[in-house]
């Protein structure tokens, strides 16, 4: 997933909003790479935010803030031209939670979403339908060769 993000954003500035990043491994790979990463924002549950803070401690200059997921409000996030990055957790987030995160898209703070999630939505939120409503069909979409049923999709304006 890192390799795909790296190839896609190449020579542009990446202002990531990591939603549900968990262990912090992907964010650390991006923050320590040759990608021009600025103003990274982390939105997650408290124990994961602590882990992400520790893992990315040496990259504090590239980090804007850490936000507790349960209290999230789009007005807490400043900026434009941001990219939401999510791996594995969109389907698990309740629809109301997704709406609050996707408010960042609605108010033009986020221009792109990079998603690596499964599409089996039985018992899960239909995050993909919401993304298509905001962006239309993804500019890139393919099934993972490593994880059957998981798709990498890039939506952007």
Specify the residue positions occupied by each region the protein language model found:
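Class I SAM-dependent methyltransferase SAM/SAH-binding core
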Residues: 37-62
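A short, conserved alpha-helix within the catalytic core of class I
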Residues: 92-105
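Conserved SAM-binding loop of SAM-dependent methyltransferases across substrates and taxa
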Residues: 23-36
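S-adenosyl-L-methionine
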Residues: 54-79
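Core SAM-dependent methyltransferase catalytic element
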Residues: 140-157
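Conserved alpha-helix/loop element of class I SAM-dependent methyltransferases that forms part
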Residues: 1-13
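Conserved beta-strand signature within the Rossmann-like core of class I S-adenosyl-L-methionine
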Residues: 109-121
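Conserved class I S-adenosyl-L-methionine
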Residues: 12-22
């Amino acid at each position: 997933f890192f390799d795909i993000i790296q190839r896609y954003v190449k020579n542009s500035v990446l202002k990531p909003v990591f939603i549900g990043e968990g262990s912090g491994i992907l964010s650390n790979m991006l923050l320590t790479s040759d990608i021009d990463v600025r103003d990274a924002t982390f939105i997650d549950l408290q124990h994961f935010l602590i882990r992400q803070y520790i893992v990315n401690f040496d990259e504090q200059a590239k980090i804007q803030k850490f936000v507790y997921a349960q209290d999230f409000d789009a007005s807490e996030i400043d900026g434009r031209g941001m990219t939401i990055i999510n791996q594995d957790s969109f389907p698990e987030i309740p629809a109301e939670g997704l709406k609050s995160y996707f408010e960042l898209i609605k108010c033009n703070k986020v221009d792109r979403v990079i998603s690596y999630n499964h599409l089996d939505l039985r018992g899960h939120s239909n995050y993909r339908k919401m993304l298509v409503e905001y962006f239309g069909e993804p500019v890139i979409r393919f099934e993972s060769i490593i994880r059957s049923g998981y798709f990498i999709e890039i939506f952007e304006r």
